[in-house]
Amino acid sequence: MSHPLIKPAKIKEFACKQSKYSIAPECPFRAIAYGPSGSGKSVLLQQLILDVYKGCFERIYIWSPSIDIDHVWDPVKRYIRKELKVDTKKEKCLFSTYNPKELSEVMDRQFKIADWMKNNGKNVFNILVIIDDFADEPSFTRQSKLLHQLYIRGRHAFISTITSVQKATTLHPLIRSQATHTFTFRLRSMQDLETW
C-alpha cells in the first residue's frame, strides 16, 4: 500500500528584518517574560529593544503602568524619538493605561500596512508590542480579546509581542500556549514553575 506524499503547495514567502544574533527568536515572535518583581524583566525588555533587535522594528508600542516613572524606559523613549524618528506628541506609542481602542487602532493599522506590503513586495515592516506588568488589571491580561489576537494572529501582520508578568497565572492559558518563546527569571516557588 502506498502513502500519499504530503508537501505544502508553493506560496509567496515574505521576509522581515531579523536580529543580528542568530540565537535570538526570529521575528515575528510571541513571547512572555516571567519573573518576580525586581528580577530584571524591564532591563531585559530594554536590551531587547536597544541591542538584540535594534533596527528590526519600524514602530515600538509599549503599554506599562510604569512607563512614565521607571527610568529604565528613558533610553527606549530616546531611541523611539531619535532612531525611529517618531514624534510621540503626534503618534502615541507609549501608554501608561490600557485602553482597548488604542491597541485596536495599532493592530488595525499594522494589519493594513502588512497587507499592502505583501501585495506590493516581499519585505514587510515589523512592529513590536510590549505589555509590561498589567497584573493588577486581569480584564486585560486574562480577558482581553485583543491580547489573545496578538498571540493568535499577530504574526500574520508581522507583529512581535512580549508580555511581561510576575506570575504566569495572571495570563490566560491561551496566551501561555501560543507563546513561541519565554524568558523565565528565577522563580520564588515550585508552584510558579509547575504552572507551565
Report residues per predicted region.
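Conserved P-loop NTPase motor cores
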Residues: 17-19, 31-39, 43-51, 55, ...
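Conserved nucleotide-state-sensing and coupling region of NTP-binding domains
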Residues: 47-98
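Small/flexible residues
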Residues: 9-12, 32, 61
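Short coil/loop residues immediately preceding or within conserved phosphate-binding loops
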Residues: 28
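Intrinsic disorder/low-complexity detector
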Residues: 2, 10-11, 89, 108-116
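N-terminal pre-Walker A segment at the start of P-loop NTPase domains
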Residues: 1-20, 67
